[in-house]
Curated annotation (Swiss-Prot):
Compartments (UniProt record): Cytoplasm, Cytoskeleton, Cilium axoneme; Cytoplasm, Cytoskeleton, Cilium basal body
Annotated segments matching region Disordered: 1-30
Protein name listed in UniProt: Protein KATNIP homolog
Organism, scientific name: Caenorhabditis elegans
Positions with biased composition (Basic and acidic residues): 1-20
This protein's record includes keyword Nucleotide-binding: no
Keyword Glycoprotein: no
Cysteine-cysteine disulfides: none
Feature: compositional bias, Acidic residues: 21-30
Higher taxonomy: Eukaryota, Metazoa, Ecdysozoa, Nematoda, Chromadorea
Disruption phenotype: No obvious phenotype. Ultrastructural analyses reveal disruption of ciliary microtubule load and organization, although various aspects of gross cilium length, function and transport are mostly normal.
Length: 568
C-alpha cells in the first residue's frame, strides 16, 4: 500500500471519529509551520486547538522539554488564559508522566476562545525535543486529551500537528513513550538526551524474551505496584505453556500420496489490488512439520525470492519484510503451488494471515481452494489477522478429502453472531489502578447451550499477573476464565492481570472456523471487588457489537453481565 493510500485511510477514519471545528480548518488554511532545527528562545506557547471528542473539557498530563545539551529545561512559570480548570499548572512539568489521578492532572473547561498554555523557561536555550503525555485519568475519559495543537517559541511557530489519544487501539502494541516532537536529528544530542530521559534510563538492561519485553517496559514506567499473591496453596506449581492443539486422528483426515499441493486464493478481506500471507507450515501424519528441503514452491507472480518468505518461520511478526504480498486481481486468481520431491502424508496446513498492520491486514486471504494432486479437497475461509501480536494468530486447516464444505458454516435459523475472533476489551476497573480481573466468561452457541472452550481457543493480554518481574506461580491465570466455578469467592479460580499504562487488558476467543454465539456471560472479579472490570467493549472480527458496564462484585455476591447477542 502506498503512503497516499494510508493517508486516505487515516483521513477517512478521522472524519468518522470527529469533524474538526471551523477554527481548526481555518488554522490549517493559514501559513504552514515548518519544524525548525534547534529553535532558540525562552517563552514556549502551547495553543490547544481541539481534543479527541469530549464536549466539555480538554487536558494534558505533562510536558517534557529537553535542550541541545541533553538536559531538561528548567521552567520558571506556567500560566494559562483560562480561569476554569482542575489540577495545578505545575503538574504539567513534574516528572510524573504516568499519573492517573484526575485531581492532579491539568484539565480545563473548553471555551470559544483558544486555550493557551505559556511555559516560561529559566533561561534562553535551544530546544531539541519536546514530549507530551496526553490526558489519561481513565481510558473512558481519554477523549479529553489534546488532539490538535500549535507551538510557538518567542512568538515564532515551531510546530502544528496532532497528538495521539492516550488510549489508542491502533498504537497499543507500540512501546508507551509519549508523543515526541524532535527538533534535531543529531545523534550526539539524542545520546545526551538519553542520559537524562527517565523513560529510557529506567528500562532494564539485561536481555529478556521478546514475548515479555513490551510488558516489562511498561511496568518499569508504572508507579509502585502493590504486591498480589495467590500461590500459597501450590507454591511449587509452575506456570505451564499450553501446547498447540493435536490434530485429531481420523481415517480420512489426510492423504498418504500427496505429490502436489495447490492453493488458489480467491479473495482478500477488502484491500484493493493486494493479497498476502505472513507464513505457511505443512504438517505430516505424525503432527510434525515437513521440512522445506522436501518441496519446492512456486507462485503465480513468478517471484521465487518473495515466495521464500512464506516458509521462513518468522510468523509471529508485524514486519512486512518477513511477509508475502503480491498484486491481486479477482478475475485472475493468485496461486501457490508446492511440489514434493517424494510423496508425503499431508495432514494439515498452518496459516498465518497477512499482519503488517491493522489497515494492511485487510490484504490477508479470505477465501481459498485447496487442491491435492489436481483434485479439489477443501474450500477454506481464512481468518483475518489482527494487526498485532498479542497471541499466536495461526489458523490450522485440517485436510479432509471427503468434505469440501466444512469451513463454510451456515448461520441457521436461530439468531446469533458469527465470527473468528471474539475480543473483549477491559477498559476500566471499579477503582484499582494496578490490577484488573474476572471470575470467568461463558459463551453459548446458537442453540443456547454452554460451549466447551479449549485452552488453545483462549488468549489474554497480559496473560496474568505472572508477567510482572516480582510475581511467579500465581494461580490466577487466564485458563481460569473458561473453567468452573465462576460464581465463587475462591481466588485460585479467578483470573487477575496487570494494568499497563495506556493499554487495556484484552481477552480473545479465537476459532479456526466461523463460530456463531448467541450469548456471552461475564462474571466479575470477586476477591477484591475494586479490581473487577467496569467498562468493556466487545468486538467480533474488528466490529464493535457491544459496550457497557459490568456490575461490581461484593464480598457475598459475584457481579455478572449477560450479553444477549440475539437482541443486537
Amino acid at each position: 500500500m502506498s503512503d497516499s493510500d494510508l493517508k486516505e485511510i487515516e483521513k477517512n477514519a478521522e472524519n468518522i471519529k470527529l469533524e474538526p471545528a471551523e477554527d481548526e480548518v481555518n488554522e490549517e488554511d493559514q501559513n504552514e509551520i515548518t519544524i525548525p532545527e534547534l529553535p532558540e528562545g525562552r517563552v514556549l506557547e502551547l495553543r490547544l486547538l481541539s481534543n479527541w471528542g469530549d464536549s466539555h473539557y480538554i487536558g494534558l498530563n505533562s510536558v517534557e522539554i529537553f535542550t541541545s545539551t541533553g538536559e531538561r529545561a528548567v521552567i520558571d512559570k506556567v500560566t494559562t488564559n483560562v480561569t476554569e480548570y482542575t489540577g495545578s499548572l505545575e503538574s504539567l512539568i513534574v516528572q510524573r508522566v504516568h499519573c492517573k489521578d484526575a485531581e492532579k492532572m491539568w484539565c480545563a473547561k473548553t471555551t470559544e476562545e483558544k486555550i493557551v498554555l505559556t511555559l516560561e523557561l529559566k533561561e534562553t536555550c535551544k530546544l531539541a525535543l519536546i514530549r507530551f503525555w496526553n490526558y489519561n485519568a481513565s481510558r473512558v475519559h481519554a477523549q479529553i486529551g489534546v488532539r490538535y495543537l500549535e507551538m510557538y517559541l518567542d512568538g515564532v511557530g515551531i510546530f502544528r500537528g496532532e497528538l495521539e489519544c492516550a488510549f489508542s487501539a491502533d498504537s497499543e502494541f507500540t512501546p508507551v513513550m509519549g508523543e515526541t516532537v524532535l527538533f534535531t536529528t543529531s545523534d550526539n544530542i539524542l545520546e545526551l538526551i538519553a542520559l537524562h530521559d527517565v523513560c529510557l534510563i529506567s528500562l532494564p538492561e539485561e536481555p529478556i524474551s521478546n514475548s515479555s519485553i513490551e510488558m516489562l517496559k511498561a511496568d518499569h514506567l508504572t508507579p509502585y505496584r502493590p504486591s498480589t499473591c495467590e500461590a500459597k496453596d501450590a507454591p511449587s506449581t509452575p506456570v505451564t505453556i499450553v501446547p498447540p492443539p493435536i490434530f485429531r486422528q481420523t481415517g480420512t483426515a489426510y492423504k498418504h500420496d500427496v505429490k502436489t499441493l495447490h492453493i488458489e486464493l480467491l479473495s482478500n478481506w477488502g484491500m484493493d489490488g493486494l493479497i498476502g500471507l505472513t507464513g505457511l507450515e505443512l504438517v505430516d501424519e505424525h503432527s510434525q512439520l515437513i521440512d522445506e528441503s522436501q518441496y519446492t514452491v512456486t507462485t503465480s507472480d513468478g517471484n521465487s525470492d518473495l515466495s521464500k518468505k512464506l516458509f521462513n518461520g518468522r510468523n509471529l511478526t508485524r514486519d512486512p519484510h518477513d511477509m508475502w504480498l503480491v498484486d491481486f486481481d479477482s478475475k485472475n486468481f493468485t496461486t501457490i503451488s508446492i511440489t514434493f520431491h517424494d510423496n508425503v502424508a499431508l495432514k494439515a496446513i498452518s496459516v498465518w494471515n497477512y499482519n503488517a498492520s491493522f489497515e494492511l491486514s485487510y490484504a490477508g486471504v479470505k477465501a481459498a481452494k485447496i487442491y491435492i494432486n489436481g483434485k479439489l479437497i477443501k474450500n477454506v475461509l481464512l481468518r483475518k489477522a489482527t494487526g498485532f501480536v498479542y497471541f499466536d494468530y495461526v489458523q490450522d486447516v485440517v485436510l479432509d478429502p471427503n468434505n469440501t464444505e466444512r469451513d463454510f458454516v451456515p448461520k441457521g435459523i436461530s439468531q446469533s453472531i458469527g465470527g473468528f475472533v471474539f475480543q473483549i476489551r477491559l477498559l476500566s476497573t471499579w477503582g484499582d489502578e494496578f490490577y484488573i480481573g474476572l471470575n470467568g466468561i461463558e459463551l453459548y452457541n446458537r442453540k443456547g447451550e454452554l460451549m466447551k472452550i479449549r485452552e488453545h481457543n483462549l488468549a489474554a493480554f497480559p496473560e496474568s499477573v505472572n508477567i510482572l518481574p516480582n510475581i511467579k506461580n500465581d494461580l490466577r491465570t487466564s485458563n481460569n476464565l473458561i473453567t468452573q466455578p465462576n460464581d465463587t469467592d475462591i481466588a485460585r479460580n479467578m483470573w487477575l492481570t496487570a494494568l499497563l499504562p495506556n493499554r487495556c487488558a484484552r481477552v480473545f476467543f479465537v476459532f479456526d472456523v466461523q463460530t456463531y454465539i448467541s450469548k456471552i456471560v461475564i462474571y466479575n472479579y470477586r476477591k477484591t471487588p475494586e479490581r473487577g472490570v467496569r467498562h468493556i467493549s466487545v468486538t467480533v472480527d474488528d466490529l464493535i457489537i457491544f459496550s457497557g458496564e459490568i456490575p461490581s462484585s461484593t464480598a457475598t455476591l459475584t457481579g455478572n453481565l449477560e450479553i444477549n447477542l440475539m437482541d443486537i
